[in-house]
Amino acid sequence: MSGPIVLGIESTCDETAASVVQGRILISNVVASSMDEHARYGGVIPEIASRAHAEAFVPCVSKALADANMTLSDVDAIAVSAGPGLAGCLAVGVSGAKSLAWAANKPIYGINHVIGHIAVTQLQFGPFPEDTLALIVSGGHTSLLHVEDVARHIDVVGTTLDDAAGECFDKVARLLGFPYPGGPHIDRHAQLGDPHAIKVPQGLTQGKAGQQHPYDFSFSGVKTAVARWIEEQQAQGNEIPVDDVCASLADSVATVLAKKAMRGCEQYDSKTLIVGGGFSANSQLRAKLLEVGAEHGVEVRVPQLKLCTDNGAMVAMLGVNLVEAGVAPSNPDFAIDSAMPLTKISM
């Protein structure tokens, strides 16, 4: 094996994670989730998540190093998610990573969590071809990005104007009575339903709005339309066809994401589309992207499920890219940025 060895630490939301990556090889990957603690509240509670990070930080990092048969002295650098994310959660991971870097006299990189979702695909697919586009879909982000240089230059092609795809799913899931997180439940029911049973709008794909925002995303109207349909059926005393609702919603969202992504690939003459973020685990989206990618001659790189959701490997992999590119480490007293812009790759 060759290449820099980087310890990656993740704590942006409800997963505490640590990983060791050497070059393009994943050596260890440890994730501790506090998801079950948030389920009864129907969403992530920042205070609970922060406390869970504090409890899981040392065990996660220790296990990641032990699984890699390494100590801190063996790593070349430490990378940690500095944003975007929940401020209290970020603070736990960043303060812990800074302490480790100071104690071991190692350089530290405060990285952009979202760009990490792009970088991690290299572990499965290798280097990025020229003019690669990336579709990042998660609970808080839906963005189309042009990857000129993952360590130095990312351009935003399109982004969400209101609800992200994951938010839309979670809100509809609550209406259907699914426990948190709702996305996997919608995915499961959608596989049993008719995707054409209910007419669900496809935001910003037609008319003047579609022309003005060819690469941007809007899912609040989708959520509202589905909610109204459910309310109308309930008012009439009709039983809700849950499988059909889920299938129609999933098909609408997947179609919009695929259309916009392919339009972006045409604009940038890109033959490679990277897909990342927790929502990229959705089976309807994965199938739709692979289908339209084949039709357009675009290679769609969808990572294995364990690399879709938040993890330390994505942080470590971006750290490797930064070290290899000769990017200067972050200042030891860098601050977290809960609203870190997508064009800022590291602090």
Residue ranges and their predicted role:
Residues 126, 149-194, 223-224, 228-234:
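Glycine-rich phosphate-binding loop plus the immediately following alpha-helix
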Residues 80-104, 123-124, 283-292:
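Short Gly/Thr/Asp-enriched flexible loops that form oxyanion-binding sites at enzyme active sites
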Residues 110-111, 290-315, 328:
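Conserved phosphate-binding/catalytic loops in two-lobed NTP-binding clefts
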Residues 15-21, 134-136, 142-146:
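Short beta-strand scaffold segments in enzyme catalytic cores
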Residues 72-82, 269-279, 301:
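Short glycine-rich phosphate-binding loop at a beta-alpha junction
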Residues 1-4, 111-133, 318:
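Conserved phosphate-binding catalytic cores of ATP/NTP-utilizing and phosphoryl-transfer enzymes
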Residues 3-84, 117:
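N-terminal beta-alpha supersecondary unit
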Residues 29, 71, 188-273, 284-296, ...:
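A contiguous, well-structured pocket-lining segment that forms one wall/lid of small-molecule binding clefts
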